[in-house]
Amino acid sequence: MVSFFDIYTKASIVEAVRFSFLNTFQLKELGLPIKEIAVPLGTLVFLFVVIITLIPLLIIGNLIWTNLRLIERENTQQYQLVFGYSLIVSDIVGFAIVFFGAILGTNLKSVELFIALGWMMMLGSLIALGTTANLVSSIYLYIKLALKR
Protein backbone atom coordinates (compact mmCIF):
# COMPACT_ATOMS: atom_id res chain seq x y z
CA MET A 1 0.00 0.00 0.00
CA VAL A 2 1.33 3.40 -1.01
CA SER A 3 0.18 6.43 0.93
CA PHE A 4 0.55 10.15 0.51
CA PHE A 5 2.96 10.27 3.46
CA ASP A 6 5.17 7.47 2.04
CA ILE A 7 5.50 9.21 -1.32
CA TYR A 8 6.51 12.52 0.22
CA THR A 9 8.93 10.99 2.71
CA LYS A 10 10.63 8.48 0.41
CA ALA A 11 10.83 10.60 -2.74
CA SER A 12 12.60 13.87 -3.27
CA ILE A 13 10.51 17.03 -3.61
CA VAL A 14 11.04 17.12 -7.38
CA GLU A 15 9.97 13.50 -7.78
CA ALA A 16 6.94 14.07 -5.56
CA VAL A 17 5.85 17.09 -7.58
CA ARG A 18 6.44 15.24 -10.86
CA PHE A 19 4.57 12.21 -9.51
CA SER A 20 1.61 14.32 -8.42
CA PHE A 21 0.91 15.36 -12.00
CA LEU A 22 0.76 11.79 -13.36
CA ASN A 23 -2.62 10.90 -14.76
CA THR A 24 -4.73 7.89 -13.79
CA PHE A 25 -3.57 5.77 -16.75
CA GLN A 26 0.09 6.23 -15.82
CA LEU A 27 -0.69 5.30 -12.22
CA LYS A 28 -2.31 2.06 -13.42
CA GLU A 29 0.74 1.29 -15.57
CA LEU A 30 2.97 1.68 -12.53
CA GLY A 31 0.85 -0.91 -10.74
CA LEU A 32 0.00 1.42 -7.87
CA PRO A 33 -3.40 1.27 -6.15
CA ILE A 34 -5.06 4.51 -7.26
CA LYS A 35 -7.45 4.76 -4.30
CA GLU A 36 -4.53 4.76 -1.87
CA ILE A 37 -2.65 7.58 -3.65
CA ALA A 38 -3.71 10.99 -2.45
CA VAL A 39 -1.08 13.04 -4.29
CA PRO A 40 -3.16 14.08 -7.34
CA LEU A 41 -6.04 15.15 -5.07
CA GLY A 42 -3.61 16.86 -2.71
CA THR A 43 -2.07 18.75 -5.63
CA LEU A 44 -5.48 19.89 -6.86
CA VAL A 45 -6.42 21.07 -3.37
CA PHE A 46 -3.07 22.85 -3.07
CA LEU A 47 -3.52 24.68 -6.41
CA PHE A 48 -7.17 25.47 -5.65
CA VAL A 49 -6.32 26.97 -2.25
CA VAL A 50 -3.42 28.96 -3.76
CA ILE A 51 -5.77 30.44 -6.38
CA ILE A 52 -8.39 31.17 -3.71
CA THR A 53 -5.68 32.85 -1.62
CA LEU A 54 -4.72 35.31 -4.35
CA ILE A 55 -8.21 36.74 -4.94
CA PRO A 56 -8.91 38.00 -1.37
CA LEU A 57 -5.35 39.27 -1.06
CA LEU A 58 -5.83 41.38 -4.19
CA ILE A 59 -9.18 42.68 -2.91
CA ILE A 60 -7.85 43.48 0.57
CA GLY A 61 -4.67 45.02 -0.85
CA ASN A 62 -6.75 47.23 -3.13
CA LEU A 63 -8.98 48.30 -0.23
CA ILE A 64 -5.97 49.16 1.95
CA TRP A 65 -4.39 51.13 -0.91
CA THR A 66 -7.68 53.00 -1.42
CA ASN A 67 -7.86 53.75 2.31
CA LEU A 68 -4.34 55.13 2.36
CA ARG A 69 -5.12 57.37 -0.63
CA LEU A 70 -8.27 58.62 1.12
CA ILE A 71 -6.24 59.35 4.27
CA GLU A 72 -3.89 61.51 2.19
CA ARG A 73 -6.87 63.44 0.82
CA GLU A 74 -8.53 63.54 4.27
CA ASN A 75 -11.82 62.33 2.82
CA THR A 76 -13.19 60.82 6.04
CA GLN A 77 -16.72 60.04 4.86
CA GLN A 78 -15.59 58.05 1.84
CA TYR A 79 -12.81 56.46 3.92
CA GLN A 80 -15.32 55.12 6.45
CA LEU A 81 -17.40 53.68 3.60
CA VAL A 82 -14.40 51.86 2.10
CA PHE A 83 -13.30 50.73 5.57
CA GLY A 84 -16.76 49.26 6.17
CA TYR A 85 -16.64 47.44 2.83
CA SER A 86 -13.21 46.04 3.62
CA LEU A 87 -14.45 44.65 6.95
CA ILE A 88 -17.43 43.06 5.19
CA VAL A 89 -15.12 41.48 2.59
CA SER A 90 -12.85 40.17 5.36
CA ASP A 91 -15.82 38.65 7.20
CA ILE A 92 -17.21 37.02 4.05
CA VAL A 93 -13.84 35.55 3.10
CA GLY A 94 -13.27 34.36 6.68
CA PHE A 95 -16.66 32.62 6.67
CA ALA A 96 -15.87 31.05 3.28
CA ILE A 97 -12.58 29.71 4.67
CA VAL A 98 -14.36 28.11 7.64
CA PHE A 99 -17.02 26.63 5.33
CA PHE A 100 -14.37 25.32 2.91
CA GLY A 101 -12.46 23.84 5.86
CA ALA A 102 -15.60 22.03 7.04
CA ILE A 103 -16.08 20.53 3.56
CA LEU A 104 -12.43 19.47 3.43
CA GLY A 105 -12.68 17.97 6.90
CA THR A 106 -15.38 15.57 5.74
CA ASN A 107 -13.85 14.61 2.38
CA LEU A 108 -10.07 14.47 2.66
CA LYS A 109 -7.57 12.19 4.35
CA SER A 110 -5.57 13.44 7.30
CA VAL A 111 -2.34 14.51 5.55
CA GLU A 112 -4.21 16.29 2.75
CA LEU A 113 -6.39 17.97 5.35
CA PHE A 114 -3.29 19.09 7.23
CA ILE A 115 -1.83 20.72 4.09
CA ALA A 116 -5.12 22.34 3.07
CA LEU A 117 -5.83 23.60 6.58
CA GLY A 118 -2.29 24.98 6.76
CA TRP A 119 -2.97 27.04 3.65
CA MET A 120 -6.33 28.15 5.03
CA MET A 121 -4.73 29.20 8.31
CA MET A 122 -2.19 31.23 6.35
CA LEU A 123 -4.99 32.82 4.34
CA GLY A 124 -6.95 33.57 7.51
CA SER A 125 -3.92 35.20 9.10
CA LEU A 126 -3.35 37.32 5.98
CA ILE A 127 -6.98 38.44 6.07
CA ALA A 128 -6.59 39.29 9.76
CA LEU A 129 -3.46 41.24 8.81
CA GLY A 130 -5.46 43.15 6.19
CA THR A 131 -8.17 43.96 8.72
CA THR A 132 -5.52 45.03 11.23
CA ALA A 133 -3.92 47.28 8.61
CA ASN A 134 -7.32 48.89 8.04
CA LEU A 135 -7.76 49.45 11.78
CA VAL A 136 -4.29 50.96 12.08
CA SER A 137 -4.94 53.26 9.12
CA SER A 138 -8.24 54.41 10.67
CA ILE A 139 -6.52 55.13 14.01
CA TYR A 140 -3.83 57.05 12.10
CA LEU A 141 -6.52 59.06 10.32
CA TYR A 142 -8.31 60.01 13.54
CA ILE A 143 -5.05 60.98 15.28
CA LYS A 144 -4.06 63.08 12.26
CA LEU A 145 -7.44 64.84 12.26
CA ALA A 146 -7.32 65.38 16.05
CA LEU A 147 -3.85 66.95 15.83
CA LYS A 148 -4.96 69.16 12.94
CA ARG A 149 -7.78 70.66 15.03
UniProtKB/Swiss-Prot annotation:
Q: What is its main location?
A: membrane
Indicate how the chain sits in the lipid bilayer: Multi-pass membrane protein
Judging by the UniProt lineage, the source's domain of life is Bacteria
Tell me the keywords, alphabetical order: Cell membrane, Membrane, Transmembrane, Transmembrane helix
Protein's recorded name:
Uncharacterized protein MPN_129
Q: Which family does it belong to?
A: To M.pneumoniae MPN_090.
Bilayer-spanning residue ranges: 39-61, 82-104, 119-141
Give the CC-aspect GO terms. Answer: plasma membrane
Subcellular location as annotated: Cell membrane
